[in-house]
Each structure stands twice: as C-alpha cells, then as structure tokens.
Amino acid sequence: MTSLLQVRDLSVHSLARPILHTLSFTLEAGKILAVIGESGSGKSTLALSLMGLLPAGFQPHGEIRLNDENLLTLTEPQWCQIRGKTLGMVFQEPMSALNPTRRIGAQIADTLRLHTTLTRSEIRDQTLALMEQVGLLKAGVSERAYPHQLSGGQRQRALLAMALACKPALLIADEFTTALDARTRADVMALVHSHTKTHRMAVLMISHDLGLVRHHADHVLVLKDGICVEQGPTASIFDAPAHPYTQALLAMSLHGAAHTPLSRLPVYTVPV
C-alpha cells in the first residue's frame, strides 16, 4: 500500500549551508508522526518544506510525494490549490497566520470559499459548525470577533478550525500546543485524533513536549543537526532508544527536566 506522504532524500541548503541532510520517511493516512529534536535541528525547516513555504535562498532537493505527487515540482499557483485543502497547517503562534483586521468567522469562511463550491449560506453554516467543533462557540466567542479579542488558546482553536475546514489529507502542526493550558491542549488533541479516525487525516506534529508525543504519536522521528538519527514506532523509541542523542533526550524528560532547554543536552557528533 502506498503511503500518503513519502519523503525521499530531502535535503535543504541555505547559502551553501546544509540544514536538512537526505531525510527519508513515510506517513500513512490516519497516523500521527512526531518530529522531535533540539532547537536548530531542522524541524521547522522540514515543516516549511512540506508546505512549500521555505524562505528565499533555501534550496530543497529530493522528493516530497503527497498522494504520489511530487510537491517540489509544483508552481506557486499549484501550491495555493493544495494549501488549506489537501494540506492543513497550524503554527505555534496563531497571530502569524491570522489577519488582525478581519473577523474570525470571515477568516474561517475564506478557506471554504476558496476550496469548495458551497453556497454563501452553506459556508456560514459550516463556519459555525467548525467553531462549535473547536469549542469557540461554547466559550462564547462570536464569529464577528477579531483576533485581538480572543485569548491565545482561542486563537489557536480558530486556526485549527481553518486548518480542518476542508478535511485535509495531511495536517502539519508545528509546536501548535506549546502555549496552551493543559485542558485546552487535551481538547485540541482530542479533536485532531477525531479527524485521524473519522477522516483518515495524517498528522506531522513537531513538538518539544515528549509527554504529548508519547501519548499521541504513532511514530517518532528524531532530528539532530538536520539528520534523522533514529525513527520508528513510538513505543520502540521511548522504551528502547538506540542512538545516544535519543537516550539523552528522553532521559532529560524522565528526570523531570521537561522544561530544560534541549540545547543543554550532551553534544553528539552526527556524521554528514
């Protein structure tokens, strides 16, 4: 069976400096893959590569196949067709994606307007349904509210509603639970899990929260200096890590150092 997402020998360079080195992995429909590693390991560069949003000067090489289509060959208009429809995105800081001058309901509706043939009334109904799903209506948030009138957690819920609006095949979630309180984090992850089961949505989740990763991810990929040092089923990675870097990373979490910067981990040289 062909995987939903196939990444083969993906390398990214910036001004001749390598950031990702021949990275390869697959992701099945309905599964969650967590990418972990210290800051600067290449996690966000991977996410931006998958979304076609690399900054100018960053050169990707290799293959990123989604539904067997090589995304690295797409033009920008073609990328615009799949972002928000086949490919959903949620970022760590919602205000980097939300327009501060437009109402929340209108921004959620934009995704439906761009990628569906729903009527105006159907779009409004679906917008309200999405706001209900992510818990905004229950929290008393109106579709006419502006982003600055929402709490950080509510903004993240609004961004998730936009990302899930068209039932994407793949959701890229880059540190999207970092700023959330425990209750909101649990609610958001429950909603994501619901979509993996009911819509077979795959999720690539970038996180420093190893407890969250262990509880929710099906597979884990460990990045160090742009290189995958280890990947496999979550239970295998957490219970029997093979690489010294992975062992140190998990040991820190186990010993109550979850909030210690990963940059303080022992240094291991990874051959290029």
Q: Which residues make up each language-model segment?
A:
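Conserved ABC transporter NBD signature motif
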Residues: 59-70
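A short, surface-exposed alpha-helical micro-motif characterized by mixed small hydrophobic
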Residues: 213-215
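A short, proline-enriched helix->beta-strand linker immediately N-terminal to the Walker B motif
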Residues: 165-169
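ABC ATPase NBD coupling module
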Residues: 71-88, 106, 114, 236-241
